[in-house]
């Protein structure tokens, strides 16, 4: 994926991992991304589960207006800065996500959703769990993004 400049503020050890994940969103690269986590950053957010569409739109707008980023669903950052990798119950259909938010965001706000399902993994915490990752792209030409409808 082109335009990953929004991750330049990340710690060096995380930059390469994020870059690889965005270039090739594979199970292995996602696992390495989770293993290398140092906590939430301006461009990376973790959600224990999918949030209601109006809250999701607010998150997406904030991230888009800050230069793009990632929301991970199925991972929770705890108060002690450790992580819970419980996953989400079901993979949410991309058409449903699009339908839920389309009335709130401009078509200029570009995003992609990736699915990660681990039936087995060498990283035990991920076994039998499902995750989704939303990548909100950096589109500086269209900033500021605003909700198209009151949420």
Region roles according to the model:
Residues 1-151:
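Conserved N-terminal catalytic/coupling substructures associated with nucleotide/phosphate chemistry
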């Amino acid at each position: 994926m082109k335009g990953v400049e929004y991750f330049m503020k990340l710690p060096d050890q995380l930059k390469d991992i994020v870059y690889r994940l965005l270039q090739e969103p594979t199970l292995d690269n996602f696992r390495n991304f989770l293993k290398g986590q140092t906590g939430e950053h301006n461009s990376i957010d973790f959600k224990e589960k999918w949030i209601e569409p109006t809250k999701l739109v607010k998150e997406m707008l904030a991230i888009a207006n800050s230069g793009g980023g990632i929301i991970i669903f199925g991972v929770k950052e705890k108060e002690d800065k450790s992580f819970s990798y419980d996953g989400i119950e079901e993979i949410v259909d991309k058409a449903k996500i699009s339908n839920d938010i389309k009335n709130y965001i401009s078509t200029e706000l570009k995003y992609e959703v990736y699915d990660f399902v681990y039936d087995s993994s060498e990283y035990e915490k991920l076994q039998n769990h499902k995750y989704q990752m939303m990548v909100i792209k950096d589109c500086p030409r269209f900033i500021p993004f605003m909700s198209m409808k009151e949420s």
